From Swiss-Prot:
The keyword tRNA processing does not apply. Its EC number is 3.6.1.31. HAMAP family: HisE (MF_01020). Pathway: Amino-acid biosynthesis; L-histidine biosynthesis; L-histidine from 5-phospho-alpha-D-ribose 1-diphosphate: step 2/9. This is Phosphoribosyl-ATP pyrophosphatase. GO terms for molecular function: ATP binding; phosphoribosyl-ATP diphosphatase activity. Keywords: Amino-acid biosynthesis, ATP-binding, Cytoplasm, Histidine biosynthesis, Hydrolase, Nucleotide-binding. It is an enzyme of class 3 (hydrolase). GO terms for biological process: L-histidine biosynthetic process. PANTHER family: HISTIDINE BIOSYNTHESIS BIFUNCTIONAL PROTEIN, HISTIDINE BIOSYNTHESIS BIFUNCTIONAL PROTEIN HISIE. GO terms for cellular component: cytoplasm. Belongs to the PRA-PH family.
Length: 126
């Protein structure tokens, strides 16, 4: 069930390819799907993220009823890919997401959510 691939390395390689397709780096929308998405702007890749998230849910629901469980992995791969396009557009890397997950490691999800709510309240009171 655990992948034998170094996840961080695979994400870093994919991120480098995606970043090379940014308009500022000469990504050609006629030759690259990623460059085309980026050229169309946030609405295009954000729409894809929404579509892929829905497909993850549908694949999981299908798996619950005897469907092909591997479709979950395929759809999550599509979701991660399009999310990485968004990260690149906004100037972030997968490493920053991993760092945030590591920061949260060992913290209860309930505690983390309560902390974020408290921080939001403090920010709105400023």
């Amino acid at each position: 069930m655990t992948a034998t691939v170094n996840t961080s390395d695979a994400l870093a390689r994919l991120a480098a390819v995606i970043e090379s397709r940014l308009p500022a780096r000469g990504g050609d929308p006629d030759k690259s799907y990623v460059a085309r998405l980026l050229h169309k702007g946030p609405d295009a890749f954000l729409k894809k993220i929404g579509e892929e998230a829905t497909e993850v849910v549908m694949a999981a629901k299908d798996a619950d009823h005897g469907g092909d469980r591997t479709k979950i992995v395929n759809e999550v791969a599509d979701l991660w890919f399009h999310t990485m396009v968004a990260l690149a557009h906004y100037g972030f890397s997968p490493g920053e997401v991993i760092a945030e997950l590591e920061r949260r490691e060992g913290t209860s999800g309930i505690e983390e959510k309560a902390l974020r709510k408290a921080q939001a309240r403090e920010a709105s009171n400023d």
